[in-house]
Amino acid sequence: NASWWIQMPDNYIPLSAPPAVPEQKKMFEDAKNKAAAIAQAVNNRQEHKEGMCLSGRLMGLAYGPFIKSLPASDKKFTVSANCTKCGICVSVCPADNILLHEHGKHEWLHQCEGCLACLHYCPEEAINIGKKTELRPRYRHPKSAVSDMKQQKGD
């Protein structure tokens, strides 16, 4: 009988740019403090109902159709001439959705999970979703590295 809402940085850059680093740091600190309070409330078996903000509720309504459209969403992905063919995009994709052929061309297999790890972890920012993301900064959690992403996949 409890629910809470914790604001974290948004990394879905087709919709909006991630917050600036100082704002991200504040979000992480606020989240850490709130998580401690949540843990205390859970330990004390306190009931708590905290609703989402309006934008969160609206996103919830769109979530079902969005999830259904994800596998083929990679059709809009592009790779610029900045690509060095390093293969990081392949290694961080949890769905094994990207092939990098010997001649250097990327192929998406239309089983995308929408995490955008390929886009965010590309060191050259060469992967984009159409023109929408070309000028938007990338986001990586400050404590997450390529090696962490590979480890989660079991690579």
Question: Where does each model-flagged region fall?
Answer:
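Long, positively charged, glycine-interspersed low-complexity recognition regions
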Residues: E125-D155
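Iron-sulfur cluster-binding cysteine motifs and their immediate structural context
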Residues: V79, I88-E107, E113, A117-E134
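A mid-sequence, solvent-exposed acidic-amphipathic segment
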Residues: L54-G87, S91-P94
